[in-house]
């Protein structure tokens, strides 16, 4: 008699994806982030569902409904802070996951990589709309500033902005539609994650050496299930420390003031995980130029497979490229810091230099260094 997990139509799919999946024997903890992102997504959907049961998407009551969740709902404070800080953890893991893909050359799986970049855009859009929902000062002004960027699109821009707003300013209609989109997008993300996995399982996982590992595979369960559970425990520990000891560490104090269209906060800025892109946007004095740079700062990820000039897939044996990648990471940290600073000297200049170096490293220096390393191989 055949084992049910190998014969049942649905269990068979789960078996081929998470149990009997042939996996390279040498993948490191950097490969944990995929499963951790899946857990984060599930956590966000569950906490979000419970928040939606008590939240009201109306400009007059949105702020007080969030206060009500924190004060009156059983463990409402825990659900709300798990959702808010869960988003931060989600983005940390997302950036680690992308960084690992760049370091080990996983972007050579074109379909998996491209759907991953589209996923990143969708997650960013979802997080932005979620930030608007508490209807605090930073929610309102963040929504106003970011949606206004679309007015830079020639000819149709201003009409498009009013269409998204549902009026002549960010108001009740905007909040209602943002709530609707924020609710539905995570389910679309879940479907896209399944496509992401489908493409990945067509080729199999990459590994730290960047070499073909068909001759050395082990079953996913129990080896990597136990490894993923260890990563999960670390994640839950970090998340609970954040929620229980400093839940507002990554938030903005301005968002504890109800939205007021007549009073602009001194420094309008998005959540910390968007600051690097925000710094690139602000570093260009032209509106359309800034918007294009903002879009391209993420879209540039799609060029990685094209810009790969090295004869080796992974950076494991390429010290020059390794150094360059860590310079890029430092550059992104500088951009994140600049994004949270006021628009004044010397921050403007630092932001412009960091933005130029961000694009130069990826578009010019990385391919050049790869080409040099190819020459060095012949020595």
From Swiss-Prot:
Keywords: Electron transport, Heme, Iron, Membrane, Metal-binding, Mitochondrion, Mitochondrion inner membrane, Respiratory chain, Transmembrane, Transmembrane helix, Transport, Ubiquinone. The keyword Ribonucleoprotein does not apply. Gene3D superfamilies: Cytochrome Bc1 Complex, Chain C. GO terms for biological process: mitochondrial electron transport, ubiquinol to cytochrome c. Heme b b562 binds at residues 83, 182. It comes from Echimys chrysurus. PROSITE patterns: CYTB_CTER (PS51003), CYTB_NTER (PS51002). The gene is MT-CYB. Its cofactor is heme b. Component of the ubiquinol-cytochrome c reductase complex (complex III or cytochrome b-c1 complex) that is part of the mitochondrial respiratory chain. The b-c1 complex mediates electron transfer from ubiquinol to cytochrome c. Contributes to the generation of a proton gradient across the mitochondrial membrane that is then used for ATP synthesis. Heme b b566 binds at residues 97, 196. One of its GO terms (cellular component) is mitochondrial inner membrane. Belongs to the cytochrome b family. The chain crosses the membrane at residues 33-53, 77-98, 113-133, 178-198, 226-246, 288-308, 320-340, 347-367. Pfam families: Cytochrom_B_C, Cytochrome_B. Heme 1 (or BL or b562) is low-potential and absorbs at about 562 nm, and heme 2 (or BH or b566) is high-potential and absorbs at about 566 nm. The cytochrome bc1 complex contains 11 subunits: 3 respiratory subunits (MT-CYB, CYC1 and UQCRFS1), 2 core proteins (UQCRC1 and UQCRC2) and 6 low-molecular weight proteins (UQCRH/QCR6, UQCRB/QCR7, UQCRQ/QCR8, UQCR10/QCR9, UQCR11/QCR10 and a cleavage product of UQCRFS1). This cytochrome bc1 complex then forms a dimer. One of its GO terms (molecular function) is metal ion binding. This is Cytochrome b. A ubiquinone binds at residue 201. Binds 2 heme b groups non-covalently. The keyword Transmembrane helix applies. It is a multi-pass membrane protein. It is found in: Mitochondrion inner membrane. Its main location: mitochondrion.
